[in-house]
């Protein structure tokens, strides 16, 4: 079954399969299935056409998913950078934006280590 441009795995439960769509997490998936009247433990391959249509309608009308959600997130980050707030500056410098330490760690955000010349550890005498 295709939903919002994503192939959902047919052998998984509906609540798990819906989380393959960007912008839909576990809680959203449960809410969508509850509104559509579908049991969360029902597999995607077992869904009737009416149930699949109901899920598509709910997602189309009430949720921002995939490319639209990604674009919204990028615009939000760009707005922070444009107004020059602290979080925006941290994004601009590719540093953690939520108060994590950066003296050590923060490698995911900072990237590969850059060696600085002239810094050697002093040996024991």
Swiss-Prot record:
The keyword ATP-binding does not apply. Residues 92-125 are annotated as: Disordered. GO terms for molecular function: rRNA binding; structural constituent of ribosome; tRNA binding. GO terms for cellular component: cytosol; small ribosomal subunit. It holds the Pfam family Ribosomal_S13. InterPro entries: Rbsml_uS13_C, Ribosomal_uS13, Ribosomal_uS13-like_H2TH, Ribosomal_uS13_bac-type. Part of the 30S ribosomal subunit. Forms a loose heterodimer with protein S19. Forms two bridges to the 50S subunit in the 70S ribosome. Belongs to the universal ribosomal protein uS13 family. Located at the top of the head of the 30S subunit, it contacts several helices of the 16S rRNA. In the 70S ribosome it contacts the 23S rRNA (bridge B1a) and protein L5 of the 50S subunit (bridge B1b), connecting the 2 subunits; these bridges are implicated in subunit movement. Contacts the tRNAs in the A and P-sites. One of its GO terms (biological process) is translation. Keywords: Ribonucleoprotein, Ribosomal protein, RNA-binding, rRNA-binding, tRNA-binding. It comes from Chlorobaculum parvum (strain DSM 263 / NCIMB 8327). This is Small ribosomal subunit protein uS13. The gene is rpsM.
